[in-house]
């Protein structure tokens, strides 16, 4: 895929975020700025917030119910894409909720619009990203209470991906999640037994910051490492038909050229080992 370089204005990215979220409006622009530094694509960011103070089932359902009106508000500014940045609100209801929410918001975004608007949900994005990596089994770290993490686990497994390990940080206060030290995630990841995992979801929550350590964790562990934020950016770039070229954000967002170089390096290393043997 190549960027549509003939575009004369920046891509307008609309974001729907929980009212207590302090992370996605930081991490999504940061990742896309790295994309811009490589290919010159330009983005502007426009957000609306839905009330969520504590992560609880009734609050998550209320968010989902209000998401359609939030889409309308964003589309008034003629955005090119809408990102619904609340993974748990969508995954809480299982696979059916993931599918229904994505379809419902896409219909709302494109009802009587002059130009098509693509819709990305963080839940759909994470599932699609894992499938693109060929991950059949994963481990993940989530900020939620165990019963909520179990819902996310069940939804991922409904999509045909086995969750080998799911670490719950047991934090109910969403603002507190946004203050977590990313270096803590690095330490936690290194303590996991990943022998039977094809990938690690370092942050299975849009509020838990992680992008500054994604690459470091991936290099230490030797398997793909992603987050709700990196998966959301990957899906957004797919919708806009832009090849991901985001540096220092893990395998998922590297360019096809970087992938080819990595494969060539691995092949050469294996050849050297055979020669030495």
Task: Walk through the language-model features, giving the residues of each.
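Periplasmic-binding protein-like
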Residues: 14-16, 79-85, 139-140, 197-205
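A short, acidic, amphipathic alpha-helical segment used as a generic capping/interface helix at domain edges
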Residues: 68-72, 181-193, 209-214
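Active-site/ligand-binding-proximal alpha/beta "capping" segment
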Residues: 191-195, 200-201, 208-224
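C-terminal functional extensions of proteins
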Residues: 227-260, 272-277
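Glycine/small-residue-rich loop that forms an oxyanion/phosphate-binding "nest" at active or ligand-binding sites
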Residues: 67, 71-119
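Hydrophobic structural segments
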Residues: 11, 41, 118-135, 189, ...
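N-terminal glycine-rich anion-binding loop in soluble enzyme alpha/beta folds
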Residues: 1-69, 144-181
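Conserved beta-alpha
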Residues: 101-172
């Amino acid at each position: 895929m190549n960027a549509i370089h003939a575009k004369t204005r920046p891509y307008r990215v609309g974001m729907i975020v929980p009212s207590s979220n302090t992370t996605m409006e930081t991490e999504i622009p940061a990742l896309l700025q790295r994309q811009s530094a490589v290919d010159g694509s330009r983005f502007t960011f426009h957000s609306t917030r839905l009330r969520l103070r504590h992560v609880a089932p009734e609050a998550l359902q209320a968010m989902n119910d209000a998401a359609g009106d939030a889409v309308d508000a964003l589309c008034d500014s003629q955005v090119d894409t809408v990102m619904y940045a609340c993974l748990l609100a969508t995954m809480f209801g299982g696979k059916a909720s993931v599918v229904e929410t994505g379809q419902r918001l896409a219909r709302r975004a494109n009802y009587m619009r002059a130009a098509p608007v693509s819709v990305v949900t963080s839940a759909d994005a994470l599932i699609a990203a894992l499938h693109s990596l060929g991950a059949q089994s994963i481990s993940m770290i989530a900020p939620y209470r165990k019963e909520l993490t179990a819902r996310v686990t069940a939804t991922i497994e409904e999509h045909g991906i086995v969750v080998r390990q799911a670490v719950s940080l047991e934090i109910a206060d969403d603002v507190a999640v946004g203050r977590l030290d990313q270096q803590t995630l690095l330490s936690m990841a290194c303590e996991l037994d990943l022998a039977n995992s094809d990938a690690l979801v370092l942050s299975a929550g849009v509020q838990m910051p992680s992008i500054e350590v994604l690459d470091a964790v991936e290099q230490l562990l030797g398997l793909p490492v992603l987050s709700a934020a990196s998966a959301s950016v990957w899906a957004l770039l797919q919708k806009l038909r832009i090849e991901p070229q985001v540096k220092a954000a893990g395998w998922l967002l590297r360019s096809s050229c970087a992938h080819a170089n990595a494969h060539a390096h691995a092949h050469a290393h294996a050849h050297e080992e055979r020669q030495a043997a």
